Amino acid sequence: MITENQLYINDLKSVMNEPLPWDKIDGSSVLITGANGLIASFFVDCLMYRNKTLNGNIEVFALCRNKEKSENRFKSYLDNNSFNLIIQDVCEPLNLNVKFDYIIHAASNAHPMAFAAYPVETMRANILGSINLLEYAKKYNPEKFLFVSSTEIYGRNNSGLNNGLKEEDCGYIDCANIRSAYPESKRASETLRVSYGKQYGINTVSVRPGYIYGPTIQDDNTRADAQFIKKAVDGENIVMKSAGNQLRSYCYVSDMVSAMLYVMLLGENGGAYNIANKNCAVTIREFAETAADIAGVKVVFENPGDIEKSGYSLIGNGVLDAGKLESLGWSAKVNLREGLKRTISIR
């Protein structure tokens, strides 16, 4: 079980060591949607670890769609009174009567094959999911509503070629391409949350993660970096299906979740914040080569299939400027090589 792995526990400890106003979250109730995912599952583990080791007394509500998968992932918490598992599709209105202090909306299709094969479901989860969560927030007025957006909302954009994309940069997205189902619906969801905030007085923020990786990544994730990690863990050669020259801002999951906490507890109402490690802006190929070197395997090349190609991101530059986030006091702690070593070791 991942929560018993000492390296993973060290990652949880590192988040707890952040100089945050923990009194704001201790004793609170927190709803996390998409709780099975790479980012949200680590967030759940952080809160439960705080309860166990620091008497956080946080009531955690993990909303997931897949009952079997979620019960397996969180089986060590199922008998814990501070943990509540909610099985529901976010496309349906929440039939709950709980006043959450914090709502973290992280439910979304999050990998290319899903975008290509299920563009409608991708859009529904983002847009209807956001509406349903925001309607719930309108009723109960939480301390903060945090929406997990994406670097892809910047579209094709050359604004940040030198120093990274800032929160006000906005590039072109081809709305007639089905691959745009993901970034367009993330954009719409960001506009929804600021609209609800303005019209109904809800305190909202959003985070725009770069390319997040870590031991909580799932085997069925078809994103290139996820597949590189899977191959490395299995001791197999890493297969690249493009030249891999696109630049990406990578960030280890513990740094991602600590950043979310900074934004949730200290972020400006209505604000959006990039999350990226400024020392981990590398090409996809460099990411693959680093993982291969750690695992002692090779990088090989193979032609992609048609469905795979249709799911590829159209973004060339995916480097983010996280200066706004850093102004809150956050800094990334884990470099790329160390993050990949931890990921491969823990998995």
Would you name each region that the model predicts?
Residues 1-7, 84, 232-347:
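C-terminal substrate-binding subdomain of Rossmann-fold SDR/epimerase-dehydratase oxidoreductases
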Residues 1-102:
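N-terminal Rossmann/SDR dinucleotide-binding element
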Residues 87-125:
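NAD(P)H-binding glycine-rich loop region in Rossmannoid oxidoreductase-like domains
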Residues 109-113, 151-158, 179, 210-216:
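Active-site segment of SDR-like NAD(P)-dependent oxidoreductases
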Residues 131-180:
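Conserved Rossmann-fold NAD(P)-dependent oxidoreductase catalytic core, especially the SDR/UDP-sugar
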Residues 150, 190-215, 226:
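Conserved beta-loop-beta element that borders a ligand/cofactor-binding pocket
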Residues 181, 185:
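Active-site helix of classical SDR
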